[in-house]
Design a protein with these regions (language model features):
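N-terminal subdomain of nucleotide-sugar transferases
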Residues: 1-35, 108, 166-171
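Short N-terminal targeting/anchoring amphipathic segment
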Residues: 4, 53-72, 86-89
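Donor nucleotide-sugar binding/catalytic pocket of nucleotide-sugar-dependent glycosyltransferases
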Residues: 32, 97, 104-137, 151-152
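Conserved donor-binding/catalytic core segment of Leloir-type glycosyltransferases
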Residues: 110, 139-169, 177
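A charged, aromatic-enriched C-terminal amphipathic alpha-helix characteristic of glycosyltransferases
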Residues: 268-273, 282-316
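Acidic donor-binding loop of glycosyltransferase active sites
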Residues: 213-229, 242
């Protein structure tokens, strides 16, 4: 059986979808879509021409599409109608609205979150994974000082991070550990230093165990981004079992409330949150680390990802 996976470039999920089908003994072929380069009419025509050529040559038994762009979904439903034996799976990977009439043509629908499922009728939630397992953790948290961790990302709300850290530093000595690089990092570091917060820049730490050593020193990860959904940084915080200060709406916000894995924060309450975490006990923070570990193992492991994909079995 031949599986063709169509995914956006830099997809969090396609690697694991491919590994899943390969583990079942299926032949897997990948088609990648650069979603940022197919906006113009002529770019779409060119891409669809190449796609038709590839699908005709491959003649797949199942198409798994994780790039849910309307024009692409429309093309795949046309292909399915012309090839009755092919099975079609749509995976709505982003919290974006897609045309339900195309989704209805699929044999199976996945979506990336509960908030996404609210407008994706008939979908099963398939949470992303980073493929890692939680390591043993030995937190060594200071009572006198607050330590934060920030994973570098172009979507970081840097001004909000600085504002929040300023409030915390008024009440308690603070240090920010930074992992990774992004374009404006040096400017951001200077802004953080200017509000009286110490900075330790680890740059890129490739080893999971080395990153865990950093997380074990930190009270909270700063998940403050101009982003919707669960991204790789959120998964890294979860796997690292570090509670989060979170500004991302949707499922993460709900997890913070229901699983007590951290604090939701916005422009209205960030001063209150800063005051609360500066006053809370280490027991509260240690319990949140346990909650984060349990949450990750419940929803975000590779085993759980594969288990959810098993539900396609009836469509094959």
């Amino acid at each position: 059986m031949l599986i063709t996976i169509i995914s956006a470039e830099h997809s969090l999920r396609s690697k694991w979808v491919r590994e899943y089908f390969a583990s079942k003994g299926y032949e897997v072929k990948m088609i990648s879509v650069n979603t940022s380069s197919v906006h113009s009419f002529f770019a779409k025509i060119h891409f669809l021409k190449q796609l038709r050529k590839s699908l005709d040559a491959l003649s797949p038994n199942l198409i798994y599409c994780g790039a849910t762009i309307d024009f692409l979904m429309r093309e795949l439903t046309v292909y399915k109608n012309k090839n009755n034996n092919v099975k079609l799976v749509f995976d709505v990977c982003d919290d974006i609205h897609v045309d339900q009439k195309y989704l209805n043509q699929a044999d199976y629908i996945f979506c990336a979150s509960e908030s996404c499922r609210a407008y994706t009728h008939g979908a099963q939630v398939l949470y992303s994974t980073n493929g890692q397992s939680c390591l043993n953790t030995s937190p060594e948290l200071s009572k006198e000082e607050l330590f934060f961790c920030l994973i570098g990302n172009k979507n970081i709300d840097m001004n909000f991070c600085v504002s929040f850290l300023r409030e915390c530093s008024i009440l308690k000595q603070c240090t920010l550990h930074i992992l990774g690089d992004w374009k404006l990092k040096e400017s951001f570091i200077q802004s953080v230093l200017s509000v009286g917060v110490n900075v330790i820049d680890h740059k890129d730490l490739d080893s999971q165990s080395t990153r865990q050593d950093v997380y074990d020193q930190c009270h909270y990860g700063l998940n403050l981004m101009d982003f919707e959904g669960i991204n790789s940084e959120s998964l890294e915080y979860m796997c690292g079992q570090i509670p989060i200060i979170n500004s991302i709406e949707g499922d993460l916000s709900q997890f913070c409330k229901l699983w007590d894995i951290g604090k939701n924060i916005d422009a209205q309450n960030y001063k209150i949150v800063a005051s609360n975490i500066c006053a809370e006990s280490l027991d509260v923070q240690l319990n949140r680390r346990l909650h984060m570990r349990n949450l990750y193992k419940t929803y975000f492991t590779k085993d759980k990802f594969f288990e959810t994909l098993d539900e396609i079995g009836g469509s094959l």
